[in-house]
Amino acid sequence: MKRILREKFFNRPTLIVAKELLGKYLVRKVNGREICGMITEIEAYDGFHDKASHASRGKTERNKIMFGPAGHWYIYFTYGMHWILNIITREEGYPAAVLIRGVLLKEGTAPLHAGRPDAAVDVPLAGRPLTGPARVTKYFKIDNKLNGEKANKASPFGKLRAGGLWIEDRGIKIPRSKIKRSPRIGVHYAGPVWAGKLHRFYIKQKDAY
């Protein structure tokens, strides 16, 4: 049974939410077709004290979404070319989020060409991994139009064909023994203590069933 995750799920300690997001489904409706994939890799960013977090230097115009209610999208641009997708966690006023780094496309995903939902030629992509946050946002056609929006099926674009973006629980529970953890990627600027925190969680492709 499919169940859309609501604010209550995300309004909990960030590391707990992060681990429980593994095995959940990221779902998007693009050009009338629903595309989806199992979340296989994430990173947690938790509070002012986390030197790897955008919020470590306080609230700004760029990161203000992190301080908002749980269950909303925080999307930002990096390296002048990539959008990065995060979901807000914890209570309002406490800046925390989970970054979605990897997705495994599954059965039921619309057959799309070369990772482009708007392509004219279709090929089956079930089982293809999207590794890296830039690949996830490119394939799912995610940009700053969704920044600050609630994670649900409602489209923020009115009558446009692009729909919402949400996360579903489809009853899959990843055993604790299958969840791997490591330091987050590319956060050396946070210093040795915070760069070394094991706040990256992932499952291997063979365990994404």
Feature map (PLM): residue ranges:
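Short polybasic linear motifs
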Residues: 116, 120
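Conserved, well-structured core segments that form or line functional sites
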Residues: 2-112, 122-156, 162-209
